[in-house]
Swiss-Prot record:
Record bears the keyword Transmembrane: yes
Record's function text: Catalyzes the transfer of an acyl group from acyl-phosphate (acyl-PO(4)) to glycerol-3-phosphate (G3P) to form lysophosphatidic acid (LPA). This enzyme utilizes acyl-phosphate as fatty acyl donor, but not acyl-CoA or acyl-ACP.
Range of residues in the leader sequence: none
Transmembrane segments: 2-22, 54-74, 85-105, 120-140, 141-161, 162-182
Functional pathway: Lipid metabolism; phospholipid metabolism
Subcellular localization: Cell membrane
Topological type in the membrane: Multi-pass membrane protein
Gene symbol of the encoding locus: plsY
GO (cellular component) term, any one: plasma membrane
Protein name, UniProt field: Glycerol-3-phosphate acyltransferase
Length: 202
């Protein structure tokens, strides 16, 4: 029972819509009505500005990061293969990612999983996250598309999990990559049409 409570708590924390709340609280804006209509960090930068964008990014990363440690902090006990699987920090973090993408608070219309996924990876393997961040910024520097850099970094996480032979990370990163690609399908279409906005600060 406690494992179910832990996973539900992880989902609800992940579902906290940082961009939406900050937009409403400090700017009196519904971020869903501007830019890409997304509640995540990238659209927060576009609509609310850099300070708010950085705050949303931090909060979204933190959501994923903190949930990884729930199995250590909460009184959960694994007494079999199934309970052991669901008390793995990566699996608990996956529920936070699902909450971020499909938040119950906003009729299941949330962000695109990038920052919260980064928080989960930070919690389980900071060195891998550093490598992925370097790849992200290299791709971003070359092509100027946040969406493309995010997808490439996600795919590299799958490859990295194979290299280090972390098979739970492999499963989670593969699922997240699928979600991320699906959530970015409109961005991908705009890239092919030459209509996707490029960043100007790099």
């Amino acid at each position: 029972m406690m494992i179910i409570v832990m996973l539900l708590l992880s989902y609800l924390i992940g579902a906290f819509p940082s961009g939406f709340v900050i937009g409403k609280l400090f700017f009196k804006k519904d971020i869903r009505q501007f830019g890409s209509g997304n509640t995540g960090a990238t659209n927060s930068f576009r609509v609310l500005g850099r300070p708010a964008g950085f705050l949303v990014t931090f909060l979204d990363i933190f959501k994923g990061f903190i949930t990884v440690f729930f199995p250590l902090w909460l009184p959960v006990h694994a007494d079999g293969p199934i309970s052991t699987f669901f008390t793995n920090g990566l699996i608990v973090g996956l529920f936070a990612i699902l909450g971020h993408v499909y938040p119950v608070y906003l009729k299941f219309q949330g962000g695109k999983a990038v920052a919260t996924s980064a928080g989960v990876v930070l919690g389980v393997n900071p060195i891998l996250l550093l490598i992925l961040a370097i790849i992200f910024f290299i791709v971003l520097k070359i092509f100027k598309y946040v969406s493309l850099a995010s997808i490439v970094a996600a795919i590299c996480c799958v490859i990295g999990s194979l290299i280090i032979q972390d098979y739970i990370l492999l499963v989670v990163s593969f699922l997240v990559s699928i979600i991320l690609i699906i959530r970015h399908r409109s961005n991908i279409a705009r890239i092919f049409r030459g209509e996707e906005p490029k960043i100007k600060w790099m």
